[in-house]
Amino acid sequence: MKKILFSMFYSILVGEEPDSVFLKKEGKQNQVKMIWVAPSSCAKDLTISEGTGATFLFNFHSRVSICFHALF
């Protein structure tokens, strides 16, 4: 898996399968939450451009939307 950091609190792990994307949040007191992002659990738009990065849009059932661009 490839780890991509996109802020001081969030990072993602991208696997070989298109749906094996993990969203990791490191909270206060070293608490770490890992969420497996699957098409059945959220609406996901993933665009990968080789050599430049990827743009991700996550819309979780908790009404939290995250959009970011990560360079590889």
Curated annotation (Swiss-Prot):
It is found in: Plastid, Chloroplast. Its main location: plastid. It comes from the Eukaryota. GO terms for cellular component: chloroplast; plastid. Keywords: Chloroplast, Plastid. The keyword Chloroplast applies. Belongs to the ycf76 family. This is Uncharacterized protein ycf76.
